[in-house]
Amino acid sequence: MLTDPIADYLTRIRNANTAFHETTEVPASGIKKALTEILKEEGFIRGFEVVDDGKQGKIRIYLKYGKNKERVITGLKRISKPGLRVYAGKEEVPRVLGGLGIAILSTSKGIMTDKEARKEGIGGEVICYIW
């Protein structure tokens, strides 16, 4: 049993990215699907598919690299952890690397990026930073 499934999700992506793997698989859940959709929309991954394995399912993530095999994802960092939750009000929504990266928040209106949260005028739990 995992104590922090989101940290495991980010670690699997980080490890596959560091090893230049084309794909990685993570156990499926609603929040992981939402995080993966944001990664796709923001251009950090090529795509993903949900694979039914007869249990909870898996998400197969297709990683993205540049022309000369440079990594598109430079870094991933878990911010709000089970032992220390981190929340941001609507005025405190963080900017990652001056807008070059994204912060992903869990808000009352669902999982969204820092830009979307600022546009909606809401805050929430800061899940992670990706740059």
Curated annotation (Swiss-Prot):
Keywords: Ribonucleoprotein, Ribosomal protein, RNA-binding, rRNA-binding
GO biological process, one term: translation
InterPro entries (alphabetical): Ribosomal_uS8 (IPR000630), Ribosomal_uS8_CS (IPR047863), Ribosomal_uS8_sf (IPR035987)
GO molecular function annotation: rRNA binding; structural constituent of ribosome
Superkingdom of origin: Bacteria
Pfam families in alphabetical order: Ribosomal_S8 (PF00410)
Family according to the record: Belongs to the universal ribosomal protein uS8 family.
Subunit structure: Part of the 30S ribosomal subunit. Contacts proteins S5 and S12.
Name of the featured protein: Small ribosomal subunit protein uS8
Organism placement in taxonomy: Bacteria, Bacillati, Bacillota, Clostridia, Thermoanaerobacterales
Designated gene of the protein: rpsH
